[in-house]
Amino acid sequence: MTAKVPRITMSGDTIVFNPEAFKLKEGARLDELIKKLPGVERRDGKLYWNNKPIRMMMNGKDLFGGDQIIGQLPAEVANKLKLYDRKSELARHTGNDDGDEDQVLDIQVKPGFLDKWYGDVKAQYQTKKRYMFEGNARKLSDHDPQMLYLQANNANRYIDKTMSSTMNSNIDGDGKSQYGSYNYQHNWHTKGTSQYSNNRFDISANLGHYDGWNTIGKSTETFFPNKEHTFAVSENYHYKHNIKPQMEARLFAYTDSVNTISVTAKASYEKSRKTNEDKGASYGYEPNKFEYHSLNAALAAKPGDALYERLITRNRNYQSSEQQDRNLYVDYAWEHFIGKSGSFSLKGYTQISGNDEDTHNNRDLEYLREKRSETVWQFYSRDNKELTTKLGATFEHWLGKKVYVNITDNVKYSRTNTTRDFFTDNNKQNVVDGTPTTLDPNNIMSNLMHTWTNQLTLKSTITPVKALMIMPKFSWNVNREKSDYRYGQLDTTAVRTSQTYEPSIFLKWKMSRVRNMDLSFAYNTTVPELVSTFGYRNTVDPLYIYTGNPMLRNSHSHTTTYNYHRMWLRKQIVLGLSASYNKDINPIATLYSYDSSTGVYESKPMNVKGGDMWTFGLNYDQGIGVYFRLMNKFALETAKSYGFLTIVDNNDPNAVPELNLQKRLGINENFEFSYEAEKVQLTLFNRLEWNRYRYDNASYNTSPLYNSVGIDATLHLSPFELYIRLADDFRSGYATSAMNGHKLMSMAYVSYSFCNNKCLLSLHVDDIFNKDIMYDSDYSAYQRSESSANYIHHYANLSFTYRFDAKAKKK
């Protein structure tokens, strides 16, 4: 008989995952193993466990190259994976836990796998003449890790790999890129500091270039009182060319056993060229008589057509711009540890940046109710220079064994100088080589801003008993701003001094090795940008005018959150429960005014009555026997918020808008039931997103639903592997009719391994039935919008990968 290896064990307060307990194909990567760990999930490119971010380490050192590098390393290098709370540098000096800790997933590397090179080279061909070439090389070492990366593709991928992070994302809806980087780190220990963080020096140089483009369709409805409603449809095509070289160097070192220094220097330059083509139309409809019309139908409508009589505006805009960004950043810190009682540190940074932009606009506008049209040529040149520097001091001290105190004071100064020259012409005779020559006095802008900020923070960790930590915190912020501001006819000098107070408290209770909970409360104040409180009037877009609001006030919020975590090791169950409450006070919303004769909107920021939101969550993960796994992530939200109904045909600046209440009930669920054997893996899944919106004006009520139910199947018949995914994606309740209904989503993948699994030939077919499209939606108490975007799908690609994984030395 062969004993079953448990997936999870405990060693003190450390959770230990055993790689042998997980079904992996030969040659699998580390990320494939980590995805299978109970409770671990990836969101927005980052790893989380029990809804808390994970800091990746290897043999107790930060993983050189960041989280994404685990996709290049073979899973067989891992002897154990340990999940634990890593104490702060101060805690390791004093022996007292100050509560400042990171949740770490530490990969323990098997003997014989260090000081070797790992990597791969990949060549890919994709239908419609797309390609990708990629090369990774990484030296796995505790002392001198290195990383080299090169790629070129026209398959819409931008991959950026540096010593601290990795980005792998779509460029846009379509695109091409080239990128290269080299990264080096040297690690060592100062005598007498082996129990603390290692000294390290890093250097990185990289150069990236990309071209990206996309077409986005959008529909927008701004909420009106019980009058004629309006509905706007638009389409935007954009293109961007970008090149960005950058260099970075970092140093952290113990000069002796009680002093550390750290320095980071980073320099970058970025140049981009952009074009935008916009088409749009708006039409009116009576309440409860909505009928969707596409943009093409609106643009094609002619006098006599029923739709033409309802049209309000149509527009076609073309924009081109060139932009340069320069940035130099240096931060520095010194910390001195005072025996077993605390530490004193000085920290600061200086940043110098500059930006300049030249932009041309060409607008064709139709005001159908006024039976007139116009063409507008615009050009502006914008220049921005900024200097920011900050210096702070921190004193940390333990009052006995149970009370820790931290006092920090930071002083920051910034100087920003922004200027914009603006030219506008309606007469083509004044346009020379596409550039207007008449100065537009209404949109010339300049702003010289000086900001002084002092932030005093007092925080503490109180440990009445070993298992309980109480961590109160209080911040006092004093902000003084001076602005010499000009926009059109507005020419003013303003000085504002603001003070904000931000209290918070965090309670953490480790009831046992397998049970813990935390409770937190935080109160925040947001001061509106000084410029938004000026009475400026931006008429760059004749159809959408933006203004400031001198009556704008501070907004506030407070959030209370509770988390509970429990494990049953023998039953291989991980359970997480969460609840939170958020209250907004005087939040800032957008108030729209509308002229029904021209179809022109005017907007300004305005404080609105506050709302609140309750959120409840359940995360459940269980291994059932040797082969089965059940996972469910469920969240319930109920929220209330307020917005303003649009003011229609009322030019009185003191007009009082009507409040509109939005009530939202939301359910999100991610369910998986999987079977994992050596040769077969099957997963049944269901993803649910449902929101119920209710308004004071019932004609705006809606309940959008998205549900995806399907199956993932993987078959391993060495040297072949086959993967198939089928899902029914269903949407309903959207104003854009094309978004609603069932869509059969599908993809398939087959691979062939040879040369002792060093070579991999694979064929991937995406969206076999050509049903996919990218949708997005946003609903507020004053507006709702829905959009769709193009991206690469319905393709086949053939790729070849060669891996040069090192093998452990035989003893």
What is the predicted role of each segment?
Residues 62, 66-67, 87-129, 144-751, ...:
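Primarily recognizes Gram-negative and organellar outer-membrane beta-barrels
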